[in-house]
Amino acid sequence: MAKSPANNAAQRVRKKVRKNVSDGIAHVHASFNNTIITITDRQGNALSWASSGGQGFKGSRKSTPFAAQVASEVAGRAAIEQGIKNLDVEIKGPGPGRESSVRALGALGIRITSISDVTPVPHNGCRPQKRRRI
């Protein structure tokens, strides 16, 4: 006789841990295809995150400023539930969601203390890929 699927381990639901953190860092990774926002505390532990693709935007709509704004609002609301009031914003990448994601976080009522660009720039490191010819 087979075991029933109602197993104790399968039914165990993990309760969401509420941290009470007032200051944090918003890491915005804006690529040409997607925008990912991760909000962490000062030590780097993730409190909330969201991406344009995770909000239902697919294909070329993922890379729009509006999709980045929606993702920032989702991540920001989850961070406010954790107690975030002040954020430093670190933007990485050249994508179209750079500015709109920062504006969306500010519109939620989170105080943005600093905005810094941490896009990695090579000091003439690896050879780039060949040019596209269309």
From Swiss-Prot:
<keyword id="KW-0689">Ribosomal protein</keyword>
<protein>
    <recommendedName>
        <fullName>Small ribosomal subunit protein uS11</fullName>
    </recommendedName>
</protein>
<dbReference type="Pfam" id="PF00411">
    <property type="entry name" value="Ribosomal_S11"/>
</dbReference>
<dbReference type="GO" id="GO:0019843">
    <property type="term" value="F:rRNA binding"/>
</dbReference>
<comment type="subunit">
    <text>Part of the 30S ribosomal subunit. Interacts with proteins S7 and S18. Binds to IF-3.</text>
</comment>
<dbReference type="InterPro" id="IPR036967">
    <property type="entry name" value="Ribosomal_uS11_sf"/>
</dbReference>
<dbReference type="GO" id="GO:0003735">
    <property type="term" value="F:structural constituent of ribosome"/>
</dbReference>
<keyword id="KW-0694">RNA-binding</keyword>
<dbReference type="GO" id="GO:0006412">
    <property type="term" value="P:translation"/>
</dbReference>
<comment type="function">
    <text>Located on the platform of the 30S subunit, it bridges several disparate RNA helices of the 16S rRNA. Forms part of the Shine-Dalgarno cleft in the 70S ribosome.</text>
</comment>
<dbReference type="InterPro" id="IPR018102">
    <property type="entry name" value="Ribosomal_uS11_CS"/>
</dbReference>
<keyword id="KW-0687">Ribonucleoprotein</keyword>
<dbReference type="InterPro" id="IPR001971">
    <property type="entry name" value="Ribosomal_uS11"/>
</dbReference>
<dbReference type="GO" id="GO:1990904">
    <property type="term" value="C:ribonucleoprotein complex"/>
</dbReference>
<comment type="similarity">
    <text>Belongs to the universal ribosomal protein uS11 family.</text>
</comment>
<dbReference type="GO" id="GO:0005840">
    <property type="term" value="C:ribosome"/>
</dbReference>
<dbReference type="InterPro" id="IPR019981">
    <property type="entry name" value="Ribosomal_uS11_bac-type"/>
</dbReference>
<keyword id="KW-0699">rRNA-binding</keyword>
